[in-house]
Amino acid sequence: MQVKKYLILLIFLSCTTSVSEKIIDTGAEASTVESNIILTEILASYQNFSNSPQNSLDTIWNYAHPDNKKITGPKENFRNMLLSEPYSSILDLKEYSFTKTVETKDNEHYEIKILASNNSYFEVTWVFQLDKCPENPINNCWLTIAVTAPSYYESGV
Protein backbone atom coordinates (compact mmCIF):
# COMPACT_ATOMS: atom_id res chain seq x y z
CA MET A 1 0.00 0.00 0.00
CA GLN A 2 2.83 2.39 0.92
CA VAL A 3 4.67 1.61 -2.33
CA LYS A 4 1.49 2.29 -4.30
CA LYS A 5 1.07 5.60 -2.49
CA TYR A 6 4.64 6.65 -3.31
CA LEU A 7 4.30 5.57 -6.93
CA ILE A 8 1.15 7.66 -7.26
CA LEU A 9 2.91 10.57 -5.59
CA LEU A 10 5.89 10.21 -7.91
CA ILE A 11 3.52 10.14 -10.83
CA PHE A 12 2.04 13.38 -9.66
CA LEU A 13 5.45 14.91 -9.07
CA SER A 14 5.85 15.03 -12.77
CA CYS A 15 2.40 16.33 -13.32
CA THR A 16 1.04 19.76 -13.63
CA THR A 17 -2.22 21.00 -15.06
CA SER A 18 -1.95 24.50 -16.35
CA VAL A 19 0.42 25.95 -18.83
CA SER A 20 2.16 29.19 -18.00
CA GLU A 21 0.93 32.26 -19.81
CA LYS A 22 4.11 32.64 -21.79
CA ILE A 23 3.37 29.34 -23.53
CA ILE A 24 -0.42 29.47 -23.90
CA ASP A 25 -1.80 30.79 -27.17
CA THR A 26 -4.74 32.90 -26.05
CA GLY A 27 -6.03 33.43 -29.59
CA ALA A 28 -9.30 31.99 -30.86
CA GLU A 29 -7.65 29.06 -32.63
CA ALA A 30 -6.86 25.92 -30.70
CA SER A 31 -3.18 25.06 -30.35
CA THR A 32 -0.99 22.56 -28.55
CA VAL A 33 2.46 23.29 -27.18
CA GLU A 34 4.90 20.45 -27.91
CA SER A 35 5.53 18.15 -24.96
CA ASN A 36 9.31 18.60 -25.17
CA ILE A 37 8.89 22.35 -24.55
CA ILE A 38 6.75 21.68 -21.49
CA LEU A 39 9.20 19.04 -20.25
CA THR A 40 12.07 21.51 -20.63
CA GLU A 41 10.15 24.10 -18.58
CA ILE A 42 9.34 21.56 -15.87
CA LEU A 43 12.93 20.32 -15.67
CA ALA A 44 14.21 23.91 -15.51
CA SER A 45 11.96 24.37 -12.47
CA TYR A 46 13.53 21.32 -10.84
CA GLN A 47 17.00 22.52 -11.80
CA ASN A 48 16.49 25.97 -10.27
CA PHE A 49 14.30 24.96 -7.36
CA SER A 50 16.40 26.51 -4.56
CA ASN A 51 16.71 29.81 -6.44
CA SER A 52 12.94 30.25 -6.67
CA PRO A 53 11.09 27.56 -4.71
CA GLN A 54 7.60 29.04 -4.95
CA ASN A 55 7.79 29.74 -8.69
CA SER A 56 9.26 26.29 -9.30
CA LEU A 57 6.55 24.64 -7.23
CA ASP A 58 3.87 26.61 -9.08
CA THR A 59 5.23 25.56 -12.48
CA ILE A 60 5.51 21.89 -11.54
CA TRP A 61 2.04 21.88 -9.93
CA ASN A 62 0.46 23.72 -12.84
CA TYR A 63 1.60 21.06 -15.32
CA ALA A 64 0.07 18.25 -13.23
CA HIS A 65 -2.82 16.32 -14.72
CA PRO A 66 -6.07 16.88 -12.75
CA ASP A 67 -6.22 13.18 -11.82
CA ASN A 68 -2.80 13.45 -10.19
CA LYS A 69 -3.76 16.63 -8.36
CA LYS A 70 -6.68 14.77 -6.79
CA ILE A 71 -4.28 12.14 -5.46
CA THR A 72 -1.38 14.33 -4.33
CA GLY A 73 -3.10 17.60 -3.47
CA PRO A 74 -3.76 19.99 -2.12
CA LYS A 75 -0.71 21.95 -3.21
CA GLU A 76 0.83 22.04 0.29
CA ASN A 77 0.79 18.22 0.41
CA PHE A 78 2.42 18.17 -3.01
CA ARG A 79 5.13 20.56 -1.78
CA ASN A 80 5.85 18.34 1.22
CA MET A 81 6.06 15.31 -1.06
CA LEU A 82 8.43 17.12 -3.40
CA LEU A 83 10.75 17.99 -0.51
CA SER A 84 10.92 14.37 0.72
CA GLU A 85 12.79 11.31 -0.55
CA PRO A 86 12.87 10.03 -3.23
CA TYR A 87 11.42 13.09 -4.92
CA SER A 88 13.89 15.55 -3.43
CA SER A 89 16.66 13.92 -5.50
CA ILE A 90 15.15 15.62 -8.55
CA LEU A 91 15.40 19.09 -6.99
CA ASP A 92 18.36 21.26 -8.01
CA LEU A 93 19.52 18.70 -10.57
CA LYS A 94 22.77 19.63 -12.34
CA GLU A 95 22.24 18.28 -15.85
CA TYR A 96 19.72 16.28 -17.82
CA SER A 97 19.03 14.90 -21.27
CA PHE A 98 15.90 13.29 -22.63
CA THR A 99 14.71 11.16 -25.52
CA LYS A 100 11.13 10.54 -26.60
CA THR A 101 10.52 6.79 -26.44
CA VAL A 102 6.77 6.50 -27.07
CA GLU A 103 4.48 8.72 -29.11
CA THR A 104 0.76 8.19 -29.62
CA LYS A 105 -2.07 10.59 -30.29
CA ASP A 106 -2.76 11.12 -26.58
CA ASN A 107 0.41 9.99 -24.76
CA GLU A 108 4.12 10.66 -25.00
CA HIS A 109 6.88 9.06 -22.93
CA TYR A 110 10.39 10.40 -22.37
CA GLU A 111 13.46 8.69 -20.98
CA ILE A 112 15.28 11.30 -18.89
CA LYS A 113 18.85 10.90 -17.69
CA ILE A 114 19.70 13.13 -14.75
CA LEU A 115 22.85 14.17 -12.93
CA ALA A 116 21.55 14.92 -9.44
CA SER A 117 22.89 17.63 -7.14
CA ASN A 118 24.74 14.93 -5.14
CA ASN A 119 26.54 13.79 -8.34
CA SER A 120 24.50 10.59 -8.63
CA TYR A 121 23.14 9.60 -12.03
CA PHE A 122 19.65 8.31 -12.45
CA GLU A 123 16.98 7.78 -15.05
CA VAL A 124 13.22 8.30 -14.96
CA THR A 125 10.44 7.83 -17.47
CA TRP A 126 8.16 10.85 -17.79
CA VAL A 127 4.67 10.33 -19.24
CA PHE A 128 2.47 13.08 -20.65
CA GLN A 129 -1.20 12.87 -21.51
CA LEU A 130 -2.93 15.27 -23.89
CA ASP A 131 -5.89 16.97 -22.23
CA LYS A 132 -7.72 20.30 -22.16
CA CYS A 133 -5.76 23.12 -20.57
CA PRO A 134 -7.42 23.99 -17.26
CA GLU A 135 -6.75 27.71 -17.62
CA ASN A 136 -7.54 27.89 -21.33
CA PRO A 137 -9.90 25.05 -22.39
CA ILE A 138 -9.78 26.02 -26.07
CA ASN A 139 -6.23 24.64 -26.11
CA ASN A 140 -4.91 21.17 -25.46
CA CYS A 141 -1.98 20.70 -23.07
CA TRP A 142 0.51 17.95 -22.48
CA LEU A 143 0.13 17.30 -18.75
CA THR A 144 2.30 15.04 -16.63
CA ILE A 145 0.38 11.89 -15.85
CA ALA A 146 3.24 9.71 -14.52
CA VAL A 147 6.91 9.63 -13.56
CA THR A 148 8.69 6.42 -12.66
CA ALA A 149 10.85 6.07 -9.57
CA PRO A 150 14.50 6.96 -10.18
CA SER A 151 16.67 4.13 -11.46
CA TYR A 152 20.32 4.76 -10.60
CA TYR A 153 23.21 3.95 -12.95
CA GLU A 154 26.97 4.51 -13.18
CA SER A 155 27.46 7.67 -15.26
CA GLY A 156 26.57 9.92 -18.16
CA VAL A 157 23.68 12.12 -19.13
Kindly label every feature range from the protein language model:
Residues M1-Q2:
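N-terminal secretory signal peptides that target proteins for export/translocation
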